[in-house]
Amino acid sequence: MAKKNFKELFDPKESKWGGISLPMFLAALVVVAIMVYVPFGLDKEGNPGSFLRPNFLIMFSALAVFGLLFGEIGDRIPIWDEYVGGGTILVFFVAAVFGTYGLVPEKFMKAVDVFYNKQPVNFLEMFIPALIVGSVLTVDRKTLIKSISGYIPLIIVGVFGASVCGMAVGFIFGKTPQDVMMNYVLPIMGGGTGAGAIPMSEMWSSKTGRPASEWFAFAISILSIANVFAILCGALLKKLGEAKPSLTGNGELIIDNSKEAIKDKEVEIKPELTDTTAAFILTGVLFMVSHILGELWESLNIGFDLHRLVFLILLTMFLNIANVVPDRIKAGAKRMQTFFSKHTIWILMAAVGFTTDVKEIINAAAPSNILIALAIVLGAVGLIMLVARKMKFHPVEAAITAGLCMANRGGAGDVAVLGAADRMELMSFAQISSRIGGAMMLVLGSVMFSFFASEKYIITELILQLGYSLAVIHLNRKKLKIEWRNYGE
């Protein structure tokens, strides 16, 4: 495959802008600019209006043009493409800058928010289920069963590695293990914002009696920093896999010496459009059932939440293991997954970027916080890669799914990490990490807050701080003696 270059982008005879020629793409860019920036008439409140209408087709196309502009350029910047993540990462960061610093109108930002993760559009709720169903249905049944028995322990290994490395670096900056666990490890490894940091803040508030926002403000900042590290690590792991092929399964998570690896049903059966349509309908029906189960679970008031995507994963796994879905529909599901993962990723990355506040990252950018967050991410990745082969997983894919997809901002973070790593086919395992792994962290958070966020924690904190101070004095006793002598003189 020929390497992409800038020359082909500006050749009118080529069609390198997402399959569109340069003249057609420039025309589309002008139309989108008019739609977004040119004022027209008045809105319902009497304020200056525009041509923009926040419906699915308009927002899909506008974000596609934005994504193609910076995505195709990013894929051709030599160092950026090779080591940072290419067009996928450039689209994300440029969109984040545009959104944070008001380079697009507020009306457009609201429309993006609705398109991306708000009702009635919520493109993310179409994107992720399509990837989950397409991924899980095309996994060999025996391999799927084997993966479940080993994947949850792999997540636990990652959390352990993250905790140890985080506490080690935290000790250097005078932070106790409890502080690192509650304020760094839990929010970073907790399954994102909505399913992790928000419910954790409520748990913290119930134990301390203080406002939940007090814990959440710092948690969301540190999570934002870790999310950036996770995305960048995804791009670096992609590069590592290319440099060291023995470390990667090229998109396959499980090592299977019996050659019963993940099989692509599309190789065996050429799907028709009706098969893809059937797979899409099946995805919608399964999502409906998952939503019903999620609502019923919430009504039971068990004490911790299970996201509906957890039920979607479990239902799809059951259908695959039970072998009740015809191969032609599985082939259609694979085609559906390919469309979303390969041809709409820049659209979603643009939407994620526009709704990401760069200032959140800047606000928590103290050197100590940055280094602790980095240590947590690298600790999860490093320990997983060390044990992955013994647990029958490919190191690169294991580190991406069980490590980085635990250390990001949930569903959107999974998309960004897998996009940067070019491993979108691993979305089902990424969702296991974010949802089931996140639920496990909520349980851990509830236990930790019960012990260490109450009055008992204050006493423990004082004892540990005293121990830390004594350790520092011991390590620097000679220096202290000299300083004391000088002071006496």
Regions found by a protein language model. Give the residues of each.
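Membrane-embedded hairpin module used as a gating/binding unit in multi-pass transport
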Residues: 23-40, 66, 214, 221-325
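Transmembrane helical segments that form the transport core of multi-pass membrane transport proteins
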Residues: 282-379, 383-387
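Structural signature of hydrophobic alpha-helical transmembrane segments
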Residues: 50-65, 114-131, 183-186, 303-315, ...
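Intrinsically disordered, low-complexity non-transmembrane regions of multi-pass membrane transporters
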Residues: 1-33, 43-50, 239-277, 324-328, ...
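C-terminal transmembrane helix pair
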Residues: 27-30, 130-131, 368-489
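Alpha-helical membrane segments and immediately flanking helix-loop junctions
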Residues: 173-218, 225, 237, 250-257, ...
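Transmembrane helix-loop junctions in multi-pass membrane proteins
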Residues: 32-52, 73-78, 98-112, 137-145, ...
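Entry/N-cap segments of selected transmembrane alpha helices
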Residues: 115-126, 135-168, 222-223, 278-280, ...
